[in-house]
UniProtKB/Swiss-Prot annotation:
The lineage of its organism: Viruses, Varidnaviria, Bamfordvirae, Nucleocytoviricota, Megaviricetes. It comes from the Viruses. GO terms for molecular function: 5'-nucleotidase activity. This is Uncharacterized protein R758. PANTHER family: 5'(3')-DEOXYRIBONUCLEOTIDASE. Gene3D superfamilies: HAD superfamily/HAD-like. GO terms for biological process: pyrimidine deoxyribonucleotide catabolic process.
Length: 183
């Protein structure tokens, strides 16, 4: 069943965080066998290409309004800190600006510990216990709900692709289930 946003109301914008690596930008092709060598390249993150449909999905999520014409989502792009390649910050910023525009730069957040992010929902491609010091994979006691992008993990809500609008149905269902949206 397809859900519409036409009859939905939100009390305040829902904080939605999307991981940059392998959710918005495809880093798998770049990493390959030369992971450490390729990440040290001067323009590594500047050369990355968005995952198909990611630009449109980001813009779409940022433009959705509720029945009262209030913005539903506050969407941020989250990227990991690189302790070995300080130039990666400049390149990541340039890449986000190149593909997503100046407004997206205001929504780019760098962090080492994802659990420190103040968000309602995180769209990520993996769970790494080292990024959640007080959390284990079984309890997933994180401060936000997690959605997996492009994986086959069955313990999580799934978004398989940005190229169809199924991602909207997944996000909307979760928001309704959590009481963040009212029909």
């Amino acid at each position: 069943m397809k859900l519409s946003f036409d009859s939905i109301v939100t009390k305040e914008p829902i904080r939605l965080a999307i991981i940059m690596e392998n959710v918005i930008f495809d880093t798998r092709d770049e990493y390959g066998e030369l992971h450490s060598e390729s990440t040290m390249r001067k323009k590594y993150h500047e050369d990355l290409k968005p995952i198909p449909g990611a630009i449109e999905a980001f813009k779409n999520l940022n433009s959705i309004t509720d029945l009262r014409n209030r913005k539903i989502f506050d969407v941020n792009i989250i990227s990991t800190l690189s302790l070995t390649n300080q130039k990666s910050y400049i390149n990541k910023i340039a890449n986000v600006q190149k593909w997503f525009g100046d407004e997206a730069l205001k929504k780019l957040i760098f962090c080492q510990d994802k659990s420190s992010i103040r968000t309602d929902i995180l769209i990520d491609n993996s769970f790494k216990p080292q990024n959640f010091p007080d959390t284990n994979k079984f309890t997933l006691n994180t401060p936000y709900l997690q959605i997996r992008y492009g994986t086959d993990e069955t313990n999580f809500y799934q978004i398989k692709s940005w190229t169809d609008n199924d991602y909207l149905d997944v996000i909307k269902k979760i928001c309704i289930d959590l009481g963040l949206l009212v029909i």
